[in-house]
Amino acid sequence: MKKIITTKHAPTPIGPYSQAVLSGNTLYTSGQIALHPETGELVLDDISTETKQVMENMKAVLEAAGMTFENVIKSSIFISDINNFGAINTVYANYFNEATAPARETVEVANLPKFVNVEISMIAVK
């Protein structure tokens, strides 16, 4: 049985997908980009600010499912420029305890939705 997770505290999906799906005790989030949930505008001031917005969006989705970043077991990070890895990693690290951080991959891709610089998806378990 699956349950669709939605929250007004994260951006409305820009396509035919859910913010997240809970199956049993496992949450599968869709990729989040730096859309501000209230205005629908992209937050692209700089890569650190953009990444923080992505993580705040993800936090809202996790909370809507009754979870926190401590429940995350896997993150997938897609970036348009590998030279931004350090700045993205610095912001990302603020949301996790290093000793219990999830598994993760970071992949440079040619393009992302709305031509953003970073997109992150996660898997979490209660």
Predicted regions and their residues:
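Short, polar/acidic, helix-capping and beta-turn segments at strand->helix junctions
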Residues: 2-126
